[in-house]
Amino acid sequence: MFRLNALSALAELAVGSRWYHGTSQPTQTKRRLMLVAFLGASAVTASTGLLWKKAHAESPPSVNSKKTDAGDKGKSKDTREVSSHEGSAADTAAEPYPEEKKKKRSGFRDRKVMEYENRIRAYSTPDKIFRYFATLKVINEPGETEVFMTPQDFVRSITPNEKQPEHLGLDQYIIKRFDGKKIAQEREKFADEGSIFYTLGECGLISFSDYIFLTTVLSTPQRNFEIAFKMFDLNGDGEVDMEEFEQVQSIIRSQTSMGMRHRDRPTTGNTLKSGLCSALTTYFFGADLKGKLTIKNFLEFQRKLQHDVLKLEFERHDPVDGRISERQFGGMLLAYSGVQSKKLTAMQRQLKKHFKDGKGLTFQEVENFFTFLKNINDVDTALSFYHMAGASLDKVTMQQVARTVAKVELSDHVCDVVFALFDCDGNGELSNKEFVSIMKQRLMRGLEKPKDMGFTRLMQAMWKCAQETAWDFALPK
């Protein structure tokens, strides 16, 4: 309505203009008529704009705007609660944040946030990864503060597409104040007594030094540790003391992507302390720190750590009667695959189609398969022998390889799930190359990838090319 009034006013102005130019009235009269027409059109336009703004302002808000306002209010409130400012200490008996029992379907915003977090996992420094995914800041008795991860935070920091809880991000933490009497009571909230995380620091929490150490242990093959131990075992008794183990740890860490990217940052407090944390040194070398660590005991520690991380990963899927669905197991296998999203979706749909009413998988079945994956290099060799001999890589062959190489039994149901994922043409035979490459990435949990976007390597290649070209010009053949 308002727009029609404005258009009619402009039309009258145009008619007046044509009349002005088409008549022979005196010049003064024409000017007065033109001025009146212009002022009238301006007044109509201005009043129309004011009325339109008033009508729009008085209209009731939409449902979406209500939700947005409520979300903004909740966000500002929660942000104030979890702010990392030193003066806003929380209650001493505050509970750890509750995990969502059921995962809602990811919306556009959630997908973009998860893509951003995946880039942090892949390309950021260990300092930033730790500060982003850690959720607790602990204030001790002297008033000093230190940031910690829970075991769940640690698993989330190395698992793609696991979204950080709302209002907890970079330098945003739940603040807790501990005293000596509360430590024993709080410990079981973060780690079970039988878990390897229970031995870490206070209450089973993970400091920055622990985080670097654990990622190093997870991303290093067992064989590398065996060689490093033998290099520093000068007397050949298979044991190393604390100083020798620190050297082993330093060398191994320098070969990992986390170690290569780490730089001590005193401003954030994330620096690698000399030696391990006191709890781990006691665990490895005894209370007096004069004990010896054997390669057997350390590899047992590595095995327990892998078991506990896998257990936490299994429990994140909220098992029903101790079982997770076949699709959830497939998601665990493909979590670090790097497969394109379209192909990944197609593989998951294929899995859902095969197991609409599946019975699920127990933790023991999942653990047996991951024990099989620990020997993936030997598995690759064995499968290659079968392939060269002309034998088909069917389920019976996979079970035979598992018994021979890893000394574990793979259930028929686990093999059915694996073949549903990697049997591309549906002929009942495994796609060997794709299966082995994806399983190698799964075993390393993506920690073996270089933590850069290739720009540095590109510059180095260009510099090397320029040097060689300049040398060719200087010394022509």
From Swiss-Prot:
The keyword Transport applies. Residues 66-84 have a biased composition (Basic and acidic residues). The keyword Transport applies. Phosphorylation at Ser-124 by AKT1 impairs its maturation and stability. Pfam families: EF-hand_5, EF-hand_8. The modification Asymmetric dimethylarginine is found at residue 457. The EF-hand domains have high affinity for calcium and act as sensors of calcium levels. The polybasic region mediates interaction with EMRE/SMDT1 and association with the uniplex complex. Heterodimer; disulfide-linked; heterodimerizes with MICU2 or MICU3. Homodimer; disulfide-linked. Component of the uniplex complex, composed of MCU, EMRE/SMDT1, MICU1 and MICU2 (or MICU3) in a 4:4:1:1 stoichiometry. The composition of calcium sensors within the uniplex complex can differ depending on tissues: a MICU1 homodimer can be present instead of the MICU1-MICU2 heterodimer in skeletal-muscle and kidney. MICU1 is recruited to the uniplex complex by EMRE/SMDT1, and it associates with MCU at low calcium levels, occluding the pore of the MCU channel. Associates with the MICOS complex. This is Calcium uptake protein 1, mitochondrial. The gene is Micu1.
